[in-house]
Amino acid sequence: MSDLPDTDFTQRFIFDERDVRGEWVSLDDSYAAVLARHEYPQPVKVLLGELMAATALLVGAMKFDGLLILQARSAGPIPLLMVECSSEREIRGMARYEADQISADATLSQLMPDGHLTLTIDPVKGQRYQGTVDLDGANLSECFTNYFVQSQQLNTRFWLNAAGGKARGLLLQQLPRDRQPDDEEREDSWQHVVALAKTLKPEEWTEGNETLLHRLYHEDAVRLFDIQPLRFNCSCSRERSGNALVSLGEHDAKALVDECGGTVEIDCQFCNERYFFDASDVAQLFAGGGTDVASETRH
């Protein structure tokens, strides 16, 4: 089978003779769409791309119907990185940063000191799950590896890369005991697949996924599953923005319009879409007329 063209997808794979599974992610267009909406400094672009790759890997690895949200927060130059990806594999991301405090060669600990990582699963049905851990690692790959070793108690490794407008990621995880009942054999097998993944060079990340996996594991029986496409999509809308005004109450919403000189502007932090509401729009919202009239948006 030939390599897939550059696109956006996740692809699961499994080692037929080992208790190990893997997941690969490639993000080109969706990552480019996020970067096109903001003028992020290079270190922010890299971290946001890596977080997007990690989020897509987790959506590909988990079984749920809903939304997965990853947030990395700190009191440093990058106070927030946030990525959302739905079970339909629609992804968006954003960052907040202090441009004058960011240097090109800054490390993760310098950009996000005393940071923490929060994973939220918001299912369509059922209870919301949220877990938070410290950003414990020299880079995001190490942080996610440490997170999942703590939470799932299964050997797990992440490799994340964002460069040249492309984001990539590789996840390896040891499966529960099945094909290899012997403890020593299981550990040797795990160390084998990890050691080969560690040989990945920065310039190899943008090669075709099948070429790369074959190069790493050509001596193993690796079975690839069907790809799962991803795409950028922002869930903001004029209706949601109008609902935010309604939640303020009629008196406060009208007062806000007056304070803003006659027009309230609501900006989407993800896609930079801007929604405008004047006094007549707000009156219509509370009269039950919805958001159909004067539905002006700007980029």
From Swiss-Prot:
Cysteines joined through disulfide linkages: 234-236, 268-271
Post-translational modification remark: Under oxidizing conditions two disulfide bonds are formed involving the reactive cysteines. Under reducing conditions zinc is bound to the reactive cysteines and the protein is inactive.
A GO MF label: unfolded protein binding
Protein's cellular compartments: Cytoplasm
UniProtKB keywords: Chaperone, Cytoplasm, Disulfide bond, Redox-active center, Zinc
Gene Ontology biological process: protein refolding
Keyword Disulfide bond on entry: yes
First-listed, main subcellular location of the protein, grouped into a coarse class: cytoplasm
Pfam family, one: HSP33
GO cellular component: cytoplasm
Keyword set includes Chaperone: yes
Function of the protein: Redox regulated molecular chaperone. Protects both thermally unfolding and oxidatively damaged proteins from irreversible aggregation. Plays an important role in the bacterial defense system toward oxidative stress.
Family: Belongs to the HSP33 family.
Protein name: 33 kDa chaperonin
Species annotation: Pseudomonas putida (strain ATCC 700007 / DSM 6899 / JCM 31910 / BCRC 17059 / LMG 24140 / F1)
Source taxonomy: Bacteria, Pseudomonadati, Pseudomonadota, Gammaproteobacteria, Pseudomonadales
Gene behind this protein: hslO
